[in-house]
Amino acid sequence: MTKLVLIRHGQSVWNQQDLFTGWTDVELTEQGVAEAKAAGEKLLAAGYDFDACHTSVLKRAIKTLNLVLETMDRLWLPVQKDWRLNERHYGGLQGLNKTQTAAQHGKEQVHIWRRSYDIPPPPLPEGDERLPDGDRRYKGLSKEQLPRTESLKDCVARVLPYWHESIAPQIRAGQRVLISAHGNSLRGLVMYLSGLSEEEITGFEIPTGRPLVYELDDALKPTDRFFL
């Protein structure tokens, strides 16, 4: 049996301000830092250890991972950063207040954008400064690979190839893996590992800074799933 640990980043500044974040690179709050440290303490107290780590290229997930590893005295562990573990891209909603957006477009429409499986928010227009095209961390990616908006389905479609290419082979080789990422990219992994339906995964909540543990058999099928 192998244990895989997933952790959503600690509370971010835009989580606190109730803004759509997506690919916007925002900092952790003091609470978010405390959540990450507490996660490391829980993992350490429960006897967890790791051989390899994965995270996105967004600093709220990177810093959460670093804080967890620092608390566990494991900052030396190898870490792979990949854009495919980024949060779902929220398109034209990024930077907008969720309550104000609901007042403008209607609660039902915003709920569809946020919680439907295959309906994305409005895309960012060409030339918008929020587009990731000129960002160095995405150098080498084609314009087609970089989203202007994403549904959860789109997010899952980029997360799963990374799982199969980079994470699953490490687990099969006996490595203990920790993944620090985002609510929707982690939903993609949960949907795949647990075999959840589109309806089930859109309602599955992953709190900030709380480790989600999978116990996997030799075929990487889950035998248990629980929050620490």
UniProtKB/Swiss-Prot annotation:
Complexes and interactors: Homodimer.
Q: Which GO terms describe its molecular function?
A: phosphoglycerate mutase activity
Q: What is this protein called?
A: 2,3-bisphosphoglycerate-dependent phosphoglycerate mutase
Which Gene3D superfamilies does this entry report, sorted A to Z? Answer: Phosphoglycerate mutase-like
Please give the function described in this protein's UniProt entry: Catalyzes the interconversion of 2-phosphoglycerate and 3-phosphoglycerate.
Database matches in PANTHER family: PHOSPHOGLYCERATE MUTASE (PTHR11931)
Query: Keywords, A to Z?
Result: Gluconeogenesis, Glycolysis, Isomerase
EC number per UniProt: 5.4.2.11
